[in-house]
Amino acid sequence: DGKLYQYPVAAIKDLRATEEAFSNRVQTKNTYELELNLEANSQSEIVLLADQEGQGLSINFDLVNGQVTVDRSQAGEQYAQEFGTTRSCPIDNQATTATIFIDNSVFEIFINKGEKVFSGRVFPHADQNGILIKSGNPTGTYYELDYGRKTN
């Protein structure tokens, strides 16, 4: 199809320690993988690294208007704001998958098996360790990851 895809190696699945249905979570260890499914003609917003007020890393999947937006403006300590705190990319209005990795201060988002990719750094506050489904009905799987090392 003339597109360049970027996707993690299959061996990353070896890091999966637990598997549960994707849902709101009050607390995580901030080391996890999400495999999400979004229906065509849908709009969903999730907040990762979320605190009790729902502030964190916002990901808005707007398939109706053909756009995915990542907003880190409420995800902990801010830096490099002169370069902006949001990133967007166009996306087709079709059934869509998103594989998301959170590793404390790093996020990676792979849309449709790597057709579109977001990577970034955030520095969440200590209480920003939840997951919030803010709107829509994304479905999928939550995997807690274990790197075999102690995390803070």
Where are these regions (language model features)?
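Beta-rich accessory regions
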Residues: D1-N152
